[in-house]
Amino acid sequence: MTTYNNKGPKPERGRFLHFHSVTFWVGNAKQAASFYCNKMGFEPLAYRGLETGSREVVSHVIKQGKIVFVLCSALNPWNKEMGDHLVKHGDGVKDIAFEVEDCDHIVQKARERGAKIVREPWVEQDKFGKVKFAVLQTYGDTTHTLVEKINYTGRFLPGFEAPTYKDTLLPKLPRCNLEIIDHIVGNQPDQEMQSASEWYLKNLQFHRFWSVDDTQVHTEYSSLRSIVVTNYEESIKMPINEPAPGRKKSQIQEYVDYNGGAGVQHIALKTEDIITAIRHLRERGTEFLAAPSSYYKLLRENLKSAKIQVKESMDVLEELHILVDYDEKGYLLQIFTKPMQDRPTLFLEVIQRHNHQGFGAGNFNSLFKAFEEEQALRGNLTDLEPNGVRSGM
């Protein structure tokens, strides 16, 4: 595990502030939005569809804390772009939006460095003000929308209106108190992690924050490599993973196979009270990966000689299958959902940090074993040939 302290020169202009929103392309946006509201504690925020004058795409916007998801579906049978995307990738993340200052400057610099500009800057407005946008191409078919608000006071963005329907079930469900997006992870095919991470360093002037390789993260069967990139202020963190050769197909390779290439593997949602959050998420019916009891037996033993003290009850953490990673300065608590759709692609993470800015490297091996158990149930923990080529899907 390597932590990087060199941020490089501060960009002259064009700040990246934070994650603005995450856009999903799905087969049925209404049902997908309802799923995330019921299972994960989101609430409807805004809507754009036929009733608001949008004739091609319907969008349901949901929010929890400062986390905003936008679920989008095509309205017409001739929408080839969204149709082809769904056939190839299934339901999943299409766009990760960043709120920025000086969108024009960021786009200009990215263009000079060779980035593909999917859509040049444009402005939309309504009675609440103006917003400037631009869209850049990143790994796979994923894009980044830059969002610059120009004295905008609306509930979401121009063209969106308040939802007209209120689900009477939602107020009766326990609150989950997920607050912000901590990080968003992109999976790449083998040998593409470096180029994907370099894209951020070169085009957005991000810097390396953290990394691990397959000598540090591996099980008997599989392994991975990961590089985390971040903006100058370190408010946006983007881990980039790739599989490393092993005896069997890794969960990273399984993702790449079922996603049809690179894409967003998981979104980490931060909370200040993970125990209450996970209790309530389980009450709502959310499924999580389970760490074995041996993990907690070893953890208890190791913590006896650690320089930090975990405040939470180890019995409760074990009961809820929450994982712990730590160093001499602090610790983090984390847990991962099972896939949020039928394809074993996108899942979510819930994380709580106590003076620890890592990504759970100490848990990677245990997590990989839990993932491998799920892979085996799906029939996907398959052998690889000696040269690392898969022997079957």
From Swiss-Prot:
Keywords: Acetylation, Cytoplasm, Dioxygenase, Endoplasmic reticulum, Golgi apparatus, Iron, Membrane, Metal-binding, Oxidoreductase, Phenylalanine catabolism, Phosphoprotein, Repeat, Tyrosine catabolism. Residues 18-149, 180-338 form the VOC domain. It is a peripheral membrane protein. It is found in: Cytoplasm; Endoplasmic reticulum membrane; Golgi apparatus membrane. Binds 1 Fe cation per subunit. The modification N-acetylthreonine is found at T2. It comes from the Eukaryota. The modification Phosphoserine is found at S211, S226, S250. The modification N6-succinyllysine is found at K132. Transmembrane segments: none annotated. It catalyses: 3-(4-hydroxyphenyl)pyruvate + O2 = homogentisate + CO2. GO terms for cellular component: endoplasmic reticulum; endoplasmic reticulum membrane; Golgi apparatus; Golgi membrane. Pathway: Amino-acid degradation; L-phenylalanine degradation; acetoacetate and fumarate from L-phenylalanine: step 3/6. Fe cation binds at H183, H266, E349. GO terms for molecular function: 4-hydroxyphenylpyruvate dioxygenase activity; metal ion binding; protein homodimerization activity. CDD domains: HPPD_C_like, HPPD_N_like. Its main location: cytoplasm. It is an enzyme of class 1 (oxidoreductase). Homodimer. NCBIfam families: 4HPPD (TIGR01263). Belongs to the 4HPPD family. Catalyzes the conversion of 4-hydroxyphenylpyruvic acid to homogentisic acid, one of the steps in tyrosine catabolism. This is 4-hydroxyphenylpyruvate dioxygenase. It comes from Mus musculus (Mouse). The gene is Hpd.
